[in-house]
């Protein structure tokens, strides 16, 4: 009986070994045909930490779970008008350029503001910009730039402005049902693989529309059909929640961003920061909020203190101080970043780190 059991186990092992041998041959064949990394085991060393491009916001980078927008993926930024969508995308371009990357901006809205982009830290001279005449042209330009493998980040502003050629050639009032949705679906099928191979971040800015006749749930939806929702690895919902005033003058907006979808880390995190008119994301204001939250800067009533020294009374006073004292800003920034990395490492044992949708 024992001999029969041993013989049966040997036979099973032989079958397993033969299967493994055939599998390895198939993997080798696929790698020869399609290149290294075309197929891999999740436990292989080839799977490394996701390379990213910073958003320009410390808190949003942290909320994204990997330190920024993942390279080789599609990102959708959507929200109401004047909520900060383009500002956030321009900050990402500036960060990519600072890291030595090449950036492109497909301006389908024909509304690119050079002076504002320069204020956000973008090198205008090296930025590739296109103002296409139709949706097909915009997506064709995007595909060509992505397939070149030389572009690190590309922004399409916006999906709503990608007008199909047939609609442009038609008469006002002609019904063109589903043309834009079909255009986006077809383009994204082609783009997804190319974006992954080129390690480029593709940001699509989108607008909101109201669905007609919705009684329950949110009536809001994004333009361009459902394809972008599925193909995007990260979706960011950006909204302005309050005005920032200097006396009676409105100088900016308090902005809330929710990570609605995230395929590289846990989703549904929400962050808030200031967007100042003409300056973009207020890194100083954001740093103060995070430093207080992490206990690096102490707040008692309206007074702020750091390492037993009083910084000032009121948030705006502290912002002015940190703007003037770069050394102090850098010192607090380094401590905040160090603590946030520590928090991320402590929370990195979660098994379920992706959104299903």
UniProtKB/Swiss-Prot annotation:
Identify the NCBIfam families for this entry.
tigrfam_recA
The entry's cellular-component GO terms read: cytosol
Main site of residence? cytoplasm
Q: Where in the cell is it found?
A: Cytoplasm
So what does this one do? Can catalyze the hydrolysis of ATP in the presence of single-stranded DNA, the ATP-dependent uptake of single-stranded DNA by duplex DNA, and the ATP-dependent hybridization of homologous single-stranded DNAs. It interacts with LexA causing its activation and leading to its autocatalytic cleavage.
The question of whether DNA damage is a record keyword is answered with yes
Enumerate the UniProt keywords alphabetically.
ATP-binding, Cytoplasm, DNA damage, DNA recombination, DNA repair, DNA-binding, Nucleotide-binding, SOS response
Species this protein is from? Chloroherpeton thalassium (strain ATCC 35110 / GB-78)
Residue positions annotated to bind ATP are 79-86
One of its GO biological process terms is: SOS response
- Family classification: Belongs to the RecA family.
Query: Which molecular-function annotations from GO does this UniProt entry contain?
Result: ATP binding; ATP hydrolysis activity; ATP-dependent DNA damage sensor activity; damaged DNA binding; single-stranded DNA binding
Q: Which PANTHER family match?
A: MITOCHONDRIAL DNA REPAIR PROTEIN RECA HOMOLOG-RELATED, RECA
Xref: InterPro entries: AAA+_ATPase, DNA_recomb/repair_RecA, DNA_recomb/repair_RecA_CS, P-loop_NTPase, RecA-like_C, RecA-like_N, RecA_ATP-bd, RecA_C_sf
- State the name under which the record lists this protein: Protein RecA
């Amino acid at each position: 009986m024992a001999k029969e059991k041993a013989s049966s186990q040997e036979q099973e092992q032989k079958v397993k070994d033969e299967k493994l041998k055939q599998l390895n041959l198939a993997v080798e064949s696929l790698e020869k045909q399609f290149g290294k990394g075309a197929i891999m085991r999740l436990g292989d060393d080839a799977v490394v930490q996701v390379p990213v491009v910073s958003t320009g916001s410390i808190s949003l980078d942290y909320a994204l779970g990997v330190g920024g927008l993942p390279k080789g993926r599609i990102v959708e930024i959507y929200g109401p008008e004047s909520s900060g969508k383009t500002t956030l995308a321009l900050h990402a371009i500036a960060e990519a350029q600072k890291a030595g990357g090449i950036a492109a901006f497909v301006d389908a809205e024909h509304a690119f503001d050079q002076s504002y982009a320069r204020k956000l830290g973008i090198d205008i001279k090296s930025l590739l910009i296109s103002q296409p005449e139709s949706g097909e042209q915009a997506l064709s330009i995007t595909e060509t730039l992505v397939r070149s493998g030389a572009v690190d980040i590309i922004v399409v502003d916006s999906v709503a402005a990608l007008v199909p050629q047939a609609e442009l050639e038609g008469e006002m009032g002609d019904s063109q049902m589903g043309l834009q949705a079909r255009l986006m679906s077809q383009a994204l099928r082609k783009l997804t693989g190319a974006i992954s191979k080129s390690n480029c971040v593709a940001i699509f800015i989108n607008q909101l529309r109201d669905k007609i006749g919705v009684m329950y749930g949110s009536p809001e939806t994004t333009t361009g059909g459902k394809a972008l929702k599925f193909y995007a690895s990260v979706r960011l919902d950006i909204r302005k929640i309050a005005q920032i005033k200097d006396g009676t003058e409105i100088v900016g907006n308090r902005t809330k961003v929710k990570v609605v979808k995230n395929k590289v880390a846990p989703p549904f995190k929400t962050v808030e920061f200031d967007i100042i008119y003409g300056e973009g994301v207020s890194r100083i204001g954001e740093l103060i909020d995070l430093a207080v939250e992490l206990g690096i800067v102490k707040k008692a009533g309206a007074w702020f203190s750091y390492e037993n020294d009083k910084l000032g009374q009121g948030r705006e006073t502290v912002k002015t101080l940190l703007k003037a004292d770069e050394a102090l800003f850098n010192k607090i920034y380094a401590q905040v970043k160090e603590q946030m990395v520590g928090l991320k490492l402590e929370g990195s044992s979660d098994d379920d780190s992706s959104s299903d949708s």
